[in-house]
Amino acid sequence: MVLASFLVSGLVLGILAQQMRPVQSRGVDLGLCDETRFECKCGDPGYVFNVPMKQCTYFYRWRPYCKPCDDLEAKDICPKYKRCQECKAGLDSCVTCPPNKYGTWCSGECQCKNGGICDQRTGACTCRDRYEGAHCEILKGCPLLPSDSQVQEVRNPPDNPQTIDYSCSPGFKLKGVARISCLPNGQWSSFPPKCIRECAKVSSPEHGKVNAPSGNMIEGATLRFSCDSPYYLIGQETLTCQGNGQWSGQIPQCKKLVFCPDLDPVNHAEHQVKIGVEQKYGQFPQGTEVTYTCSGNYFLMGFNTLKCNPDGSWSGSQPSCVKVADREVDCDSKAVDFLDDVGEPVRIHCPAGCSLTAGTVWGTAIYHELSSVCRAAIHAGKLPNSGGAVHVVNNGPYSDFLGSDLNGIKSEELKSLARSFRFDYVSSSTAGRSGCPDGWFEVEENCVYVTSKQRAWERAQGVCTNMAARLAVLDKDLIPSSLTETLRGKGLTTTWIGLHRLDAEKPFVWELMDRSNVVLNDNLTFWASGEPGNETNCVYLDIRDQLQPVWKTKSCFQPSSFACMMDLSDRNKAKCDDPGPLENGHATLHGQSIDGFYAGSSIRYSCEVLHYLSGTETVTCTTNGTWSAPKPRCIKVITCQNPPVPSYGSVEIKPPSRTNSISRVGSPFLRLPRLPLPLARAAKPPPKPRSSQPSTVDLASKVKLPEGHYRVGSRAIYTCESRYYELLGSQGRRCDSNGNWSGRPASCIPVCGRSDSPRSPFIWNGNSTEIGQWPWQAGISRWLADHNMWFLQCGGSLLNEKWIVTAAHCVTYSATAEIIDPSQFKIYLGKYYRDDSRDDDYVQVREALEIHVNPNYDPGNLNFDIALIQLKTPVTLTTRVQPICLPTDITTREHLKEGTLAVVTGWGLNENNTYSEMIQQAVLPVVAASTCEEGYKEADLPLTVTENMFCAGYKKGRYDACSGDSGGPLVFADDSRTERRWVLEGIVSWGSPSGCGKANQYGGFTKVNVFLSWIRQFI
C-alpha cells in the first residue's frame, strides 16, 4: 500500500497514534488509502467480475499502513454473488435472480403456482386468469362434485359452473335438493342429492301395530313395531329402509305370551330372576332366566341357569344343592367318616365291585355307623355292584339293627344303641352316556365342573371323586381357552388344576415363575404333596394375566377354588354288565371307570378260605361289551375241624392214606365169580381218559388249609395220658365227606375202684392198711383257730380229679345245715399217716373251691347226709391217688344184701380210744334195716333207718367205724370183671351215742345210689 503524497506533521501522527493504541485491531478511514478490488464469481457457473473495496488506515509500531476496512477478505465478500444470475460492480445486490428465486441476494424461494409470476425483489406472485390467492393456488369458482350413477345433472356454465341442476333416472326418487349454487367462498350451497329406490309399504302385524313416518319410504325411513297385550314381538322391534329399496330385516310377528310353570324351592340355594320380555304379565314368562347359587358348603348339581323356552318348558331340570363328601371313598370306608347333621344328606361315590370285597354291615334299611358304607348301599338296593353315587343320611341314634341277606350281601344283627344312617337316591342329571352331566361343560375329550368353593388340595380331590370325577389335569402347553373363559366368567383367577406329565421315559422338567427348574423322575401328576420334588406344594393355574395363564405352586393345605374333570372317552367305550358278587369269594378290580365296567377293565377273582376257584381267574371286558369268560365259582373244600381233645387224653391226626385199604371182614373180593377167564378179564372197566383240566379233587387238594382243618380221609387217633384212664368212645375216627368225624366222641375216664395192692381176702378184724391200698381215700382237715392247727377230722372219697364226696355233717357247723367256709378246709389224697410231717412227696394237698350240701340234709337225724367238695386244683392220678367207682342199680341190689361184706377205712378212733396214726380198715357185714332198728330199740335208743341209709356191723360189736371216720368210704368188691373193682355204696354217717363197737348198735351209712342224679349235676 502507498501512502498519500502529502505529509502529515509529526505532531498530528503522534496524537493519532496515542488515540489508536487501545484499539489496534480496527482501521480508521482517514481518506489516506485508495480502493482495492476483489475478483468474485457471479452466478454458478457464472462469470468473474471485480468488486471494489474501501480501505482504511492501520498502524503497526507507530507506522501507518492500508488494508480493507473491517479486515474483510475476498472469502467474506464473493460467496453471496454466486446466487445471482447477473451482477454489477459497485452494486451491493444482485442485478437479476435465477428462475424461482427472489430477494437482494436471490436467497428466497418463489411459491407461485399454476403459472403465477414471482417478483424478483419481494417474491410476490402475479396470478394468471382463473387463479388467485397468495401463491395462485386457488381456482376461481366451486369445485366439481361426484354424483351417483343414477343422478343426472346440468352444469351452468359447463366449464366453470355456478349452478348445477339434478334429476333422477326413472324408478328412483331424488333424495336432497334439486339445485345447488357456487357460493363466493368457493363452496357449494349443499351436497349433491342421491337417487334412491323406495321401500315397500308395510302393514301392521296381526295383534300389533307399526309406527311409520309420513312421506315416501326411502332410505333411512324407520318403522317401529309393537304388540297388543298379552302378545310379544318375535323379530326386530325397528326396521330401516336401505338404499337398495329393502327393509333391514324380516317383518316381525306378534305371538301370544307363554309362561313356564312355577319352580319348586331349592334347599340351601339362592336364586336370581331375569325377565326375558318387556311385558311382565306373570312370574316366569318365556325368556325368563333363573340363576341358582348354593350357600355355604353345598355344591350345585345341575345347570346353574334355567331359561323359560317359547313352548312353556324350562331349558332343564331344577338343580339341587348337596353336601359332597371331601374324602375319597373305597369299599372299606365306614359311614361314620361321612355323616353330617341328623337328616342331612351327604353325597358319596362308591367304586365298582364293593359287593366282591369283605366288609361288615349291620342292619337293614337303617344301618350302624361303623358299617361298610358302599356294601350297605348295595345291600339296601340303592347301588348296583358297578358303583355310583348315593346320598348318605344321618338317621340319628338307633338300636335293634336287623340282619338280612339282600342283593348278594349278608348283613348282621346288632342290638346296641348307636348312631345310624340310611340312603337316598341321587337323581340322574346327565345328558346321556356320550355327553357331559348337567352343569358340566365339555373341554376337548373331557367334562369339566368348576366351583368357587374353596378347599385344600386333598379335600378338593375328595369332592371331585365323589362327583364321579377327579381333580382336573391339563398339559403344560394345552390350556383350552374355553376353560379360562369359564374361570374368568366365574371370577376365579387361581384354581387347583394339576399339571400332567407327558413322557414317562424322560424326567419331567417344569419351569417355575422364578425360572428355576424342578426335575421329576416319574410320570406322576405334578400336583400332590409327597411327590418327588414336591413335598408340601401343589400346582394351581393362575389366569390373572389376561394374555398368558401361568402355572404356580402353593401350600397344598391352602384353600383354593378347583375344577373337576371326567374323561368322555370312557363314556363312549363299550360297557359290560355288572357280573355281580362272587359268593364266598373276593375280587380285585383293574382299570374300571368310576361309574362302571368299560372295555379294557378286568376283574381278578379269588376265593375265601376253604374254597377253591373253578373257572377263569381273570375276566376282561371286551370291546363288544361282553366279558372274556363266565364268572368263576368258589367251591367249598370239605374239611373236618379239629376234633375235640378229651380231658387227660390226646389225639393224633394222620393224613389221608394214599393207598386203598383192604377190609379184613366182609371183603366182596374174597369170593371169585365162576366166569370164563376171558370174560372175567373183560369185566374190568376200561381206563378213563386223562383230562388236561385239573379235576375238582386236584383243585381241592391244592388249597392250603388253615390251622385246625383236615382233609377228607384224615384219621384221628385217640390215647389217654396214663394207665389211670380208660378210653370211652371211638379210638380212631375218620374225616368223612360230609365234614364230620366218624364214630363216637372219645373221652378219657379215670379208671375207678382199682387198687394196686396185692389181691387178698378180707381181714375180719380192724387193722392197718398198706400204703396206697385204698387210693380213693381222702383226708379232710379243718383249721382250728383256737388251737392254731389243722385237724384231720373226716374222710372222703375221690370221685374224679376235682370232686370229693363226704358226709354233710363234716362240712357244716354242728347241729346246723350252715356250710363252713371252704377256706377252712384242706384235702389230702394219697395220705397214709395222720401226722402231716410224715407225708411223702406222693401226698397231694388241695384247697377247697366250693362245697355243696344236699339241699334236703337234716342235721337232726342225719338224713340226706351227703356233700360234695370241689377242689381248687385237680389232682394227678397216680398209684396212690385214684377215684372210686360209683354204684349202679345192679351193684346196689347185689351189695346191700344182708350179710354182704364191705370195707370201711379211715383215721378214726380205735379200740384204745385214740385216733389212728395210720389209715385203718375194717370189714363189716351189711345189716338189714329192721335188725338195725331192733338193736337200737333194745338199747333204748330208738331210731329210724330211712331209705337214704343202710346199716353195717356185727351183732357183738367190736369192729365198727368210729369218730374221725365220718364221711369216709364203705366200699364193696366187684369181681364181675376180670380185674377186681371197688364200688362206693356207703358214706360213714352215724353210730351209737354210747360209743363205737357196741353190741347190736350198728354203724349207719348214707346210701350213695340214692344220690347219683344229684351227684351228676356237679361232676
Curated annotation (Swiss-Prot):
Residues in C-type lectin domain copies: 436-568
Domain Sushi stretches: 140-197, 198-256, 258-323, 574-636, 689-750
A cellular component annotation (GO) from this entry: extracellular region
Signal peptide: 1-25
Keyword Protease: yes
Name under which the protein is recorded: Clotting factor C
Annotated ranges, domain EGF-like: 102-137
Keyword Repeat applies: yes
Reaction(s) catalysed by this chain's protein: Selective cleavage of 103-Arg-|-Ser-104 and 124-Ile-|-Ile-125 bonds in Limulus clotting factor B to form activated factor B. Cleavage of -Pro-Arg-|-Xaa- bonds in synthetic substrates
Family: Belongs to the peptidase S1 family.
Record GO terms (molecular function): carbohydrate binding; serine-type endopeptidase activity
The organism's taxonomic lineage, starting at the top: Eukaryota, Metazoa, Ecdysozoa, Arthropoda, Chelicerata
Every Peptidase S1 domain range: 763-1019
Record note on modification: N-glycosylated.
